[in-house]
Amino acid sequence: MSDTVERVKKIIVEHLGVNADKVVENASFIDDLGADSLDTVELVMAFEEEFGVEIPDEAAETIFTVGDAVKFIDKASA
């Protein structure tokens, strides 16, 4: 598992209080992990801070799953 995946999982577990076993690549923040719209905004802000990347609103609106977040961060960090 990549460093990005581990760090994203850690942020999600800390912010949403979910079991790490539920934080899998295709898990939806809202449908599978119980996040609401405020939670998703806070997750995006936490990802930006942790990885030193900017996630524009347009991009944030396309990040629905753990895998989406990892792909965006890896691409933005490259």
Curated annotation (Swiss-Prot):
<dbReference type="GO" id="GO:0016020">
    <property type="term" value="C:membrane"/>
</dbReference>
<comment type="pathway">
    <text>Lipid metabolism; fatty acid biosynthesis.</text>
</comment>
<keyword id="KW-0963">Cytoplasm</keyword>
<comment type="similarity">
    <text>Belongs to the acyl carrier protein (ACP) family.</text>
</comment>
<keyword id="KW-0276">Fatty acid metabolism</keyword>
<dbReference type="GO" id="GO:0005829">
    <property type="term" value="C:cytosol"/>
</dbReference>
<keyword id="KW-0596">Phosphopantetheine</keyword>
<dbReference type="GO" id="GO:0000035">
    <property type="term" value="F:acyl binding"/>
</dbReference>
<dbReference type="InterPro" id="IPR006162">
    <property type="entry name" value="Ppantetheine_attach_site"/>
</dbReference>
<protein>
    <recommendedName>
        <fullName>Acyl carrier protein</fullName>
    </recommendedName>
</protein>
<feature type="modified residue" description="O-(pantetheine 4'-phosphoryl)serine">
    <location>
        <position position="37"/>
    </location>
</feature>
<dbReference type="Pfam" id="PF00550">
    <property type="entry name" value="PP-binding"/>
</dbReference>
<dbReference type="GO" id="GO:0031177">
    <property type="term" value="F:phosphopantetheine binding"/>
</dbReference>
<feature type="domain" description="Carrier">
    <location>
        <begin position="2"/>
        <end position="77"/>
    </location>
</feature>
<dbReference type="InterPro" id="IPR003231">
    <property type="entry name" value="ACP"/>
</dbReference>
<dbReference type="GO" id="GO:0000036">
    <property type="term" value="F:acyl carrier activity"/>
</dbReference>
<keyword id="KW-0444">Lipid biosynthesis</keyword>
<dbReference type="InterPro" id="IPR036736">
    <property type="entry name" value="ACP-like_sf"/>
</dbReference>
<keyword id="KW-0275">Fatty acid biosynthesis</keyword>
<dbReference type="GO" id="GO:0009245">
    <property type="term" value="P:lipid A biosynthetic process"/>
</dbReference>
<keyword id="KW-0597">Phosphoprotein</keyword>
<dbReference type="InterPro" id="IPR009081">
    <property type="entry name" value="PP-bd_ACP"/>
</dbReference>
<comment type="function">
    <text>Carrier of the growing fatty acid chain in fatty acid biosynthesis.</text>
</comment>
<keyword id="KW-0443">Lipid metabolism</keyword>
<dbReference type="InterPro" id="IPR020806">
    <property type="entry name" value="PKS_PP-bd"/>
</dbReference>
